[in-house]
Structure formats: structure tokens, C-alpha cells
Design a protein with these regions (language model features):
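Basic, helix-initiating cap at the start of DNA-binding domains
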Residues: 1-26, 30-39, 55-59, 64
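Short hydrophobic/aromatic patch on the recognition helix
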Residues: 40-51
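Hydrophobic alpha-helical connector segments
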Residues: 60, 71-100, 151-155, 179
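Amphipathic alpha-helical packing segments from all-alpha helical-bundle domains
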Residues: 102, 113-140, 149-153, 180
Length: 192
């Protein structure tokens, strides 16, 4: 019997799992292609055939993790309240994700690319998901008018800042308060 599984997909999962393990064990800056290859039980050329350098591996890992959180937090229906609840839940998951937080805190040069210079794949995935939910909320009447992608991009900026900077304001806003205030900010921004 011939297997219908994609062996490349299995190898990529092993590589990304190994990259995550290395980041947790050694930190972002000390994670190497050699150690990822060793942990994934593949050769370095196998990794290099898929990604040109360590930054690309980490970027792919972040994309997989962030898209995975979006899948873990189910759509809660149409309307502004459901949209805001889902965004806040996704943000909370990402604030608690060890890999995401390790990159933000320990690889500022890499993080700054996606904070200040350009949209990453995972950010575009989030904007597209937001735009879809915003469009549904507009049709339902609970979200203000405007281009759904523009509104989604602004929601991403608001939410991304809480993921990146929550630790900085933890003296004033604990995790529950961050969720409450993020919810208010998004709800107010999206209200008709």
C-alpha cells in the first residue's frame, strides 16, 4: 500500500519542533541550524533546502504557532462582541506562548522586522481573519463602516502592542486587566 502522507510535511514539522525546543533550551540567539538538524534527525542541507537561514526557520515557526492559535480559538459567531472576544483570547494565548515571547524579548532585531518594518505572513493571516469577521459584523450592523482590511490592520496594531508590551505595564495592568482594557479599546474602535 502506498502512503498518502507527505513526507516533506513530516520533515518540516520535525524541523520546526526541533527549532522550538532549541529556542526554549538555548534562547533565540544561541539556536543554530546544526542543533536544529541534530534534534530533528536531519542533515543541515535538508533544512537549507527549505529555509535559507535561521531567521527564516524562526519566522516560519512563528507563523505556524500564531496561525495555530487562531485555529485553537474558534470563531465565536458574527458581530462585534464575538469578534472582540476572539481577538482578546488570541492575544492572551500569544502573551503566554513561550516561543513568541522568547523572540520578542530575546531577539529584538528579528522582532523589530515584524513590529516596525513589514508585515509577516502570520500578521497578514490575522488581518485577513479580522477583515472577514469585521465584514460579517458590518453586515450584521454591529461594526462601523469602513474598509474591513483597514479596520483589521488597526485592530492588529492595537492588539499586537498588548502582546509585545504587557510585561512592561504589568505593575499597572495584570493579565485580566489587560484583557478587559484591550476588549474596551477594540469594542470602542469597532462600534458604529
Amino acid at each position: 500500500m502506498v502512503s498518502i502522507r507527505n513526507p516533506d510535511s513530516s520533515v518540516e514539522h520535525r524541523i520546526l519542533d526541533a527549532a522550538a525546543a532549541c529556542i526554549l533550551a538555548y534562547g533565540v540567539e544561541r539556536t543554530t541550524m546544526t542543533e536544529i538538524a541534530r534534534r530533528a534527525r536531519v542533515s543541515r542541507p535538508t533544512i537549507y533546502r527549505r529555509w535559507p537561514d535561521i531567521r527564516w526557520v524562526i519566522a516560519e515557526l512563528l507563523t505556524v504557532r500564531i496561525a495555530g492559535v487562531l485555529e485553537q480559538v474558534p470563531d465565536r459567531g458574527a458581530g462585534r462582541a464575538a469578534l472582540v472576544d476572539r481577538v482578546v483570547a488570541v492575544a492572551e494565548h500569544l502573551r503566554q506562548d513561550d516561543i513568541v515571547q522568547s523572540v520578542i524579548r530575546n531577539a529584538p532585531n528579528l522582532a523589530m522586522v515584524y513590529i516596525a518594518e513589514r508585515l509577516g505572513t502570520s500578521q497578514q493571516i490575522l488581518i485577513d481573519a479580522l477583515a472577514e469577521a469585521i465584514g460579517a459584523g458590518q453586515r450584521e450592523g454591529s461594526v462601523r463602516t469602513g474598509d474591513p482590511h483597514e479596520l483589521g490592520a488597526m485592530c492588529l496594531l492595537i492588539t499586537q502592542s498588548t502582546i509585545q508590551s504587557a510585561q512592561m505595564v504589568s505593575k499597572h495592568l495584570d493579565a485580566e486587566a489587560i484583557n478587559v482594557e484591550l476588549s474596551r479599546a477594540l469594542d470602542g474602535y469597532l462600534a458604529p
